[in-house]
């Protein structure tokens, strides 16, 4: 039975917050302030809070009281959802009060709140195409990211004309909490951050709005300072997996080409997800002099990964620091490995921490950001022949075996499927050679098979992408060169 939209939304706000029935008129006027009184007589069949919020926005657009640009609607939508979101002080008090007796419950409650108030965009994330496919490195995870809407040309034009602002300094800064937003900076009225201490300094814990995996979290420094991989990084990651049980924690590398998209603010990512790299076995055990108590091995993975395990955090940090320092200064001309050129460093590490079976675990992924005439985008970066699938930097998430592929592939891959079935002769030029190869390999392909064939090929290409990003190749020569670096570490003081 249809009910009044505003009244139903207000009822849901009261049920999901500390507002009471006496606050109904006040809340109704809050809603009118945001979306206009022109929505007063609209009816709804829904009782789901986020659906009701979306209906209010659309009614406001129709009435002319809400702008047509998605960015304008997001600003108002976040304010509507802020009505059910406790103040930051309450969020933090509730989190740490619960944490004292049940850390897992404290985390679960904060995650539930972040979904309930639409900060984590559950409906948008559900639009992503996601699947697993077998490769010689195990099952890789493929996602075509459709959750983040592409910019409307009108929004791009409006952003160009917007008054310049450097507040907040970036999208990770603490000052985003409760920030209204603008045409070129996301709405954050319903954003909340849990504060915690590391090294007697304030850090923030939040969820990623457009999550790439389960409980995708961000842990960021309270001050706007650039990313830097150092001994402190290893200690912080191991502290995070201790403080937030069940979560892994990792850092993007701190150099261009091999780093993430935000290098200007010190932050780490984590969450409750088992990535393909985590379940990959050890290709060859190695040992480090003076660290017989630390289990170590080269991981069977397309990228160059050393895995360290110990019950003692301090020992892991000490060995990881030694490996980092050695890698930063290590060159091997025959292997194509160069520590620096013209004073510019090329070497860093992408580190990932976990706590498993009573032990701490560190995966150290060796990175090299050299470029050359042949590979101007990066020698250890997706090469030209696979850039039709993935040309962006290989950051932390891809390193671990989860491909984040661009939205364009949704339609482009459908065109490739049609081409293989003989139902279309048009594919994007960047895919033509690949489509012809698939057609030659599968001359009698059926409609029942075609999606799986294309998806499997995409996964195989992603495995190749990771091989390109790997400093040491996965053949016997590459393994010998990798072990030569291990020997170098053992010779170092």
UniProtKB/Swiss-Prot annotation:
Task: Keyword check for Disulfide bond, yes or no.
Answer: no
For this protein, what is the EC number? 2.7.7.12
What metabolic or biological pathway is this protein involved in? Carbohydrate metabolism; galactose metabolism
Reported effect, residue 480 to D: In strain: SMQ-301
The GO terms this record gives for MF are: UDP-glucose:hexose-1-phosphate uridylyltransferase activity
Major place of residence: cytoplasm
Give, from the UniProt record, the effect of changing residue 70 to N: In strain: SMQ-301
Enzyme class comes to transferase
Catalytic activity reads: alpha-D-galactose 1-phosphate + UDP-alpha-D-glucose = alpha-D-glucose 1-phosphate + UDP-alpha-D-galactose
Q: Which domain of life is it from?
A: Bacteria
UniProt entry keywords in alphabetical sequence: Carbohydrate metabolism, Cytoplasm, Galactose metabolism, Nucleotidyltransferase, Transferase
In which compartments does the protein localize? Answer: Cytoplasm
Which InterPro entries does the annotation name?
GalP_uridyl_Trfase_II, GalP_uridyl_Trfase_II_CS, GalP_Utransf_C, GalP_Utransf_N
PROSITE patterns in alphabetical order: GAL_P_UDP_TRANSF_II
One GO term describing the cellular component:
cytoplasm
GO BP terms: namely:
galactose metabolic process
A Pfam cross-reference name: GalP_UDP_transf
Give, from the UniProt record, the effect of changing residue 42 to V. In strain: SMQ-301
Q: Do you know which HAMAP family this protein is assigned to?
A: GalP_UDP_trans
| Record family assignment | Belongs to the galactose-1-phosphate uridylyltransferase type 2 family.
Q: What is this protein called?
A: Galactose-1-phosphate uridylyltransferase
- Originating gene: galT
């Amino acid at each position: 039975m249809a009910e009044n939209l505003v009244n139903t939304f207000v009822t849901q706000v009261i049920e999901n917050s500390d507002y009471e029935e006496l606050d109904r008129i006040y809340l109704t006027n809050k809603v009118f302030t945001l979306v206009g009184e022109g929505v007063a007589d609209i009816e709804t069949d829904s009782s789901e809070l986020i659906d009701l919020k979306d209906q209010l926005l659309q009614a406001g657009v129709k009435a002319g009281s809400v702008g047509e640009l998605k960015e304008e609607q997001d600003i108002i939508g976040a304010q509507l959802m802020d009505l059910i979101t406790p103040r930051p002080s309450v969020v933090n008090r509730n989190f740490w009060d619960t944490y004292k007796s049940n850390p897992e419950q404290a985390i679960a409650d904060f995650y539930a709140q972040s979904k309930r108030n639409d900060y984590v965009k559950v409906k948008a994330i559900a639009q992503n195409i996601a699947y697993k496919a077998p490769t010689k490195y195990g099952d890789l995870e493929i996602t075509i990211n459709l959750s983040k809407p592409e910019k409307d040309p009108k929004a791009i034009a409006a952003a160009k004309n917007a008054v310049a602002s450097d507040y907040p300094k970036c999208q990770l800064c603490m000052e985003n909490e409760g920030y209204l937003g603008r045409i070129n900076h996301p709405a954050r009225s319903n954003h909340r951050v849990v504060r915690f201490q590391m090294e007697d300094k304030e850090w923030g814990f939040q969820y990623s709005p457009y999550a790439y995996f389960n409980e995708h979290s961000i842990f960021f420094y309270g001050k706007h300072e650039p990313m830097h991989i150092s001994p402190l990084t290893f200690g912080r990651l191991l502290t995070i997996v201790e403080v937030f049980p069940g979560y892994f924690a990792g850092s993007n590398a701190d150099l261009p080409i091999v780093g993430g998209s935000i290098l200007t603010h010190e932050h780490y990512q984590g969450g409750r997800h088992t990535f393909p790299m985590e379940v990959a076995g050890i290709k060859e055990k190695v040992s480090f002099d003076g660290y017989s108590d630390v289990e170590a091995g080269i991981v069977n993975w397309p990228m160059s990964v050393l895995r360290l395990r110990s019950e003692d955090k301090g020992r892991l940090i000490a060995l990881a620091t030694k490996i980092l320092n050695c890698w930063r200064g290590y060159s091997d001309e025959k292997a194509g490995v160069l520590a620096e050129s013209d004073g510019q460093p090329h070497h860093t590490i992408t580190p990932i921490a976990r706590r498993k079976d009573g032990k701490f675990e560190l995966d150290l992924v060796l990175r090299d950001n050299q470029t050359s005439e042949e590979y101007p985008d990066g020698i250890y970066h997706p090469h030209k022949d696979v850039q039709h699938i993935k040309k962006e930097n290989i950051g932390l998430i891809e390193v671990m075996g989860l491909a984040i592929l661009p939205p364009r592939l949704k339609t482009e891959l459908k065109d490739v499927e049609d081409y293989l079935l003989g139902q279309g002769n048009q594919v994007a030029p960047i895919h033509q050679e690949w489509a012809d190869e698939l057609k030659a390999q599968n001359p009698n392909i059926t409609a029942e098979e075609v999606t799986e064939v294309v998806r499997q090929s995409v996964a195989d290409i992603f495995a190749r992408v990771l091989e390109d990003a790997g400093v040491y190749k996965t053949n016997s020569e590459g393994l010998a060169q990798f072990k030569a670096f291990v020997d170098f570490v053992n010779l170092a003081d």
